[in-house]
Amino acid sequence: MSDLDQIIRITLTRASQPVATASFQIPLILASFTNFEERTRVYTDMQGVAADFDSTDGVYKIATKLFGQSGVGAVPPSIVVGRKDALESWVEALDAVNEDNSTWYVLVADTKDAADQEALSDAISANRKIYGLSTADAVAPTTGTTDIGAILSAKSAGRTFGVYLPTAAEDYPEAAWIGAQLSYTPGSNDWDFKRVNGVTVSKLSATAKNNLREKNYNFYTEVGGVNIFQDGNMFDGLPIDEQIVIDWLYARLQESIYFRLINSLKIPMTNPGLAIIENEIRTVLSQAEANGAIDRGWSVSTPDVLSIDPNLRAQRTAGVFVFRARLAGSIRRVNLEGYLSV
């Protein structure tokens, strides 16, 4: 202890209380097994998975796809494996798993049954999470309407995406795609045109591709000598990455404002107080722009405190704050005109 420390002793305490932040990089494998008693376990590599599951188990096969994409994409920092009991429905199992561990963002379920997939899609639609499935149903590339894609497309299932692949039962293409793309920062990547490891290429006619697109399926084919996924959309026809960006914005705005509320003695119902909330909104939008999620030129409108309804002021409810931003999106098609002369 220095001489000055003997005279003046100072204790510094970090006053800011952190809040839990939602992760958008962690997939969940939901499967029926008896390998462990707890409802969920977290794994950070295949070595851990291999210690609990045989190579013939569905969980092992799915995890291999999730962790096996380092050469063509990113790798999840961890995965959650959730257990389904034999007497549970898939939705009951999902609810129980989510109660035990809700840190995951995208679901991969070890079932190819269309009724199970529809039920899981309906359940996911009520949460800020997404679900990736695959099917080898021969009806999918036709004009038939009994396959899972036709069913979910009719529902505009905007939190579920699906892959048609004749070898879906063995290849788990949705898991490979998730493993390659989920770990990128939301807003920085488009899921279209992406390569993966360990997935058999489909050979599809132009008619089959058209039928699949009519139902908002994705598929894995060879284009220009490269094997790629197309089209990177949910069953409502909107891009997968767009839904992820929307969920990211919702979570980060909520977390940022909550952080400021719990780490302030109070935020006064005054114009300077409203400016504190505005600053939190601007911080998140600035990060969204840096991530490539939104274009520059966004704006935030903050109300004057006297324009807020007196009843809301009495309830200590501030607003309405309004921000406007354009999603940056991505380029998927290019039109070009060239004029040559001699």
Name every feature range the model reports, one short phrase each:
Residues 1-342:
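Surface-exposed assembly/interface segments
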